Amino acid sequence: MKFKLFFLSSSVLGPIALFTTACSAVYRFDQVDDGKIKLATVTSASASGSLTTIISKYNSQKDPNDYPVELVSLDSRGSYSNGKKDLQAKLLAKDKNNFYNLTFNYSDVVSILSRSQMELSFDTVDTSNFDPSFLSFNNNISNVNPNSIYALPATVSGEVLVLNGPVLHYILSSAKKDSNTTLSTHSASNNSNKGTMVVASDSETSSLWTKLEAAAKMNAQTNETQVLKSNSSESNQTQASDTEIKKIWGDYQEVDGGLKNYTFKASVFNNWKDLNDFATRIAKSFTKLQTTTKKGEEVQAVFGIGSLENALYTALFASGKADYNNFLFNIKNQRINFSNFFNKSSTAFQNLKTIFNSFKSLIDQNGLISNAHFNTPVNDYAKFNQLAFYTSSTARFPYSFASDSVKRLIVNDKTIENKNNKSVFEVNLSSDSDNNSNLIGTVSLENSKQVSLYEKQVDSNKQIGVDALLIKDETLINHLKSLKSQVSAKSASETSQTKQNKTFLAFTTVNADQKAIFDVGKLNGKTAKIIINATETTNAKISTLQEKEAIVLKAPQRFESTDPFPIALVQGPSLIGIHANEREDIETKKFVNWYLNTKVQWEENSIKTPAEYVADKASYLLPFKNRLNNTNSYNEFVKTAVSQFADKNVTKFAEPADFLSNKVRDGVKSNLNAAINNHSIDFDSFINDLTDYLGSDVKNI
């Protein structure tokens, strides 16, 4: 069984292929005993900070004869793919001096290590705190003893389905039949297109509608109008919310195949097939969604999927009766087996076709979007009411909701949020009075820290990456110089809520295109971009999704309602050991045992294990038995995921792990995204393109 894998671009396939062919010649080797245990990480800032804290705690409490632990950062952007590439390079080089002892990564890394006999078993570590079902993925990793433990699920995440309450309220209110007593709310802005949709009267649907109404009322109560709204009728409050949502979504249209004569039930969110059908009907009912190319601030889709691969894999596993023999690939006799994929008569292949076509209907109506790696996540679009609902990893909870007033940049079809007003800063244009012809701009960061932008050469009293950036791109240089003599003032078209055609420095992972978004290197350890011709908007509370306005449900547990077993995806990086030498292996396990089992007092006076401390700080789920039964301290995403993990009737799905399964996942992801961007791609084209992408590495297994 396997947790979530890495995303690799085609540019990485060369080194991967090299490793595939060469690793058979790389045998087990000992690292130099340097007297310390190195933990390599590519985690987020919040997780890195908590790891630094627990390592400091361990080093201060350990026995003087025990080895200290040191944190090694491989990629500050959180790219587990880059972490894996670094590990592969060190294996190929037999790097005895710069390798590490532990890493957080996905479990196919164990399979990679095992091909060089460099895996480290945790059989002697006390893992009794874990719920045993969360350790069972170890017996579904290729090339290792299925009865041993090599990967510890210390940072688990699940998937949830998040409904944008105000948006969905507007959609349903617009489409509903006026005579339907279940919904008494006025349709949005007295829409003249009277709906004919019927709302079911079962208890589950009634309960959901109550939550949607509450979300719409809450959305209407902005800080500026709260007093007014508190004196208004409930129907006027929800209508105020609907009016705001209509600005983005436009008018509802009664069309065949849309919500016309449709019966809405809450159970539509329980399986992928019905959910895709519902989303398709919504897409047909709003003409703004029919536009293929959308600007960054416009409605984007009905349904956003955080991970297309996870959606397809869980739907496929559910439709195959929760049997890995009916999955796209599996592990047999400690080797990966792709026979189901290449056999068009197999249950897995036929199910794959049905599932693809279910999503294809939604794609054809411009109703589906997905995350593009290191680009705008679906959570960000939902935050600004540009989606009706989306699936998300529980780990993205901290990034999913807006504060009362949010600023963001609109750049063509991309958006960049100014998180906590600490990630986007306007570039101030230099003038002739600055007495430096190479100075082409300045930026004031938080705490009034000044950063200077130079062409050609930086002043001798400045340090690149600290208080200066050297701009090398000629397009960007020419843009900044052309603005140099202009007065920095608002144009007549600007309002207090908008800055148009401005230049900004942003700390963001959005991909540079060297046209409007330029990569300018690292600034104080963070990736910096300069964005030109951007519009900065300030979004009030009523035009954004607040945490209390979201309705968090379990991600669909079946492909269709008749599937016999409900499925819950388990994903996330594991703590993985790497062989070093006899002494360091012992010291590594000693630290891991402390990490999992020792109760420690932390700065907020809480007493918990280091593993619990890290998981709580980074919004991960730690599947300890005692924590699955107590969800009081969890956020709504994690609480929802835990509720299904704790359900004995739910089958946990974790992807089979092999050094090649990563390539399959990346191929599925890239080709599904291609189908979203190119509606001419049908199932046959999808399979042909995926087969070509996988190449001989997979075909010859």
Curated annotation (Swiss-Prot):
Lipidation feature positions (N-palmitoyl cysteine): 23
Domain of life of the organism encoding this protein: Bacteria
Residues spanning the signal sequence: 1-22
Pfam families according to UniProt: Lipoprotein_10 (PF03202), Lipoprotein_X (PF03305)
Compartments where located: Cell membrane
Record membrane topology: Lipid-anchor
Lipid modification (S-diacylglycerol cysteine), residues: 23
Keywords: Cell membrane, Lipoprotein, Membrane, Palmitate, Signal
Family matches, as PROSITE patterns: PROKAR_LIPOPROTEIN
InterPro entries, per the entry: Lipoprotein_10_C, Mycoplasma_lipoprotein_cen_dom, P68-like
Annotated Gene Ontology cellular component terms: plasma membrane
Family per similarity comment: Belongs to the MG185/MG260 family.
NCBIfam families: lipo_P68
Protein's name in the database: Uncharacterized lipoprotein MG185
